[in-house]
Amino acid sequence: MSAEQFVGRWKLVESENFEDYLKEVGVGLLLRKAACAAKPTLEIKVNGNKWHVNQLSTFKNTTLEFTLGVEFDETTPDGRQFKSTITIEDGKVVHVQKRIKDSDHDSVITRWFEGEKLITTLQSGSVISRRAYIRE
């Protein structure tokens, strides 16, 4: 798997169990409803080990900049803070969010390809959400 495969604009086309995932990680009801109604587009740019990911939606636009394998401070769209590390393992991009506050919950976000779709799973505890994107 080449990191270059991820480069481009990706539009959300399928979403399963996303609200349950958001509830598991502690996102409030109003923000959960808004996030579930949004149909985000991902803009991904890669330069060597440095990645730049914009998530664009009517809910909120966010930017994530990171270097593969290097821990960084991450603030989620709803304001939760994590120590995060993103790596490539077995052809998948694995994003580990480790909580800073005891009231938050760790998550693992994994991205890979199935045919022409970019698949994303979000897992916290036993709750797993699956989302699929297609290239714009």
Swiss-Prot record:
Xref: Pfam families: Lipocalin
Gene Ontology BP term (one): fatty acid transport
Any GO CC annotation of this UniProt entry: perinuclear region of cytoplasm
Top-level taxon in the UniProt lineage: Eukaryota
InterPro entries listed in its UniProt record: Calycin (IPR012674), Fatty_acid-bd (IPR000463), ILBP (IPR031259), Lipocln_cytosolic_FA-bd_dom (IPR000566)
CDD domains linked to this entry: FABP (cd00742)
One MF annotation (Gene Ontology) recorded for this entry: fatty acid binding
Positions contributing to a fatty acid binding: R111, R131, A132, Y133
UniProt keyword annotation of Transport present: yes
Family: Belongs to the calycin superfamily. Fatty-acid binding protein (FABP) family.
Name assigned to this protein: Fatty acid-binding protein homolog 5
Provenance organism: Caenorhabditis elegans
Gene: lbp-5
